[in-house]
């Protein structure tokens, strides 16, 4: 037994020597009291999804715009100013935070978590799949899936229903159709296995990400949590691989015509880098990244759009008036849709108030300066996007829903750049941001044109929780009455 104190002392000395620069930097920053060795790991490990993002914002109010948390030997620094955010997102020496690497079982080494030369290559190869001209060609296909949703909602005859599931099915079908050319048809079945697999995978991965004890792959892969996750991943990967192989065979039979990529999957299958095609694993990683990130974030955003429309009926009236001269069918004029200021303002305000991705992180790889402070290698810099979007310095009355704050004709003053970054920013800005906005605008416009939406009188006051994305803890219940 006498050996344990000696081992503990040795471990402490080793950590102090190895992490001395980090410890010294951490001691120069304000933050909550930290235990020796453990730091604030116990506090972070106890944070529940429904308030974890609020705690990080409250700590800003207590300790200032830049504060630290310690998780054992790790140093987390939270940034809350628009200028520091701009610098961090443009710093070429930073890479994605190590925490995001825990998404690898689902999305592999896709754009969301890759960095360095691999990220640069993949970004360059994928960019053609998101050109405006190609996105425009998706409108009719998206419109078809939206019409199926309109039919489903109309069939409820004004009964209240929770909106997340029908939105998720519609968006999953639309995203897979336009990015892979495949028909999942999840809107026509109840309890689709792949939808359930996406939901469960997201919850299980988030449980791991907020538990410091599971940061080690070796430990995590020996838990029941991993076994549950692996079961869901088998469903997702088998479905995606089946679609990839089917399309690869079709292109092979066609002779792989150059310049004929019609979507993201075609772009990946036809891509060449230094004469070499992408591996099936690389293709699957990028497809899974796009589908998972796209459907989860856009579903959450659209849920809050419908909540806002139903809670504030005047927004429906104003938007419906703005839409009266816009065709919303296979001939939809996307220029006209993109030129509607109130639709744009409504979506911007939803993405600000209900910050779909509350935080993003970067890892220092060498000494770098941000906001006049020098950070050594090994620091995790967390950008609190929720805190930025709810900072009264940038947004007066920040917790109020005010689409007019984005309308110059209503006297709005533009907020500082990088105080509003729903799709992140800098070189790593979300490659699918225009696609996501296209989905949201088409869906919002069509539903407002078709229905009068009302919030259930039994809808509890909105309580948010952060999982992979921000969601309404108790769901959002809305009725859809035909105009």
Swiss-Prot record:
SUPFAM superfamilies hit by this protein: Cytochrome P450 (SSF48264)
Protein name as it appears in the record: Probable cytochrome P450 311a1
Binding site for heme: 430
Record PROSITE patterns: CYTOCHROME_P450
Cofactors: heme
A Pfam family of this chain: p450
This protein's UniProt keywords: Endoplasmic reticulum, Heme, Iron, Membrane, Metal-binding, Microsome, Monooxygenase, Oxidoreductase
Lineage: Eukaryota, Metazoa, Ecdysozoa, Arthropoda, Hexapoda
Major localization listed first in the record, in broad terms: endoplasmic reticulum
Source organism per UniProt: Drosophila melanogaster (Fruit fly)
Subcellular location: Endoplasmic reticulum membrane; Microsome membrane
